[in-house]
């Protein structure tokens, strides 16, 4: 196994990364899998060096084990790291994967008739997002998303009403036949 470190922007996303790639037995390293799309993205963004690289510092630095496969065999016996640009892109992609997963889970729960709070709690537990308190953040995210949908719908209805009003302009028909 080859090792690389990834600084993650948020503790919530650190927990989500642990959900995507479970730790190996007896180790704190996450085992990256190429079966997951984000795993493929991680592997594709690895940079190699012929000399040792410094380990990133911070609270949310994750140690990843990269499996030896056909596509990673040229990484063996080299020092692996992520560039600052790739760390930024990977964090943005991880957030997008999280958002899509949450939105999909939430929508399926709503479609089945479950309450919003129950869906969010089930998502937190199923994804093992318990080392931080993501409840408020997810409730706020859901609220903002619903607010955007309501505003979009209100704008659509206002445009539709305006169109109908203009098409039915009756200003020239003020006389009533007797």
Locate predicted features.
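Long, low-complexity interaction regions most often at the N-terminus
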Residues: 1-86
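Positively charged, polyanion-binding regions of nucleic-acid-associated proteins
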Residues: 91-112
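Short, charged amphipathic recognition helices of the HTH superfamily
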Residues: 107-127
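Short, basic interhelical loop/turn and adjoining N-cap
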Residues: 124-137, 162-163
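Major-groove recognition helix of helix-turn-helix-like DNA-binding domains
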Residues: 131-150
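Short Lys/Arg-enriched helix C-cap and helix-to-coil transition segments
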Residues: 149-166
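Intrinsically disordered, low-complexity, charge-dense segments enriched in Lys/Arg
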Residues: 169-178
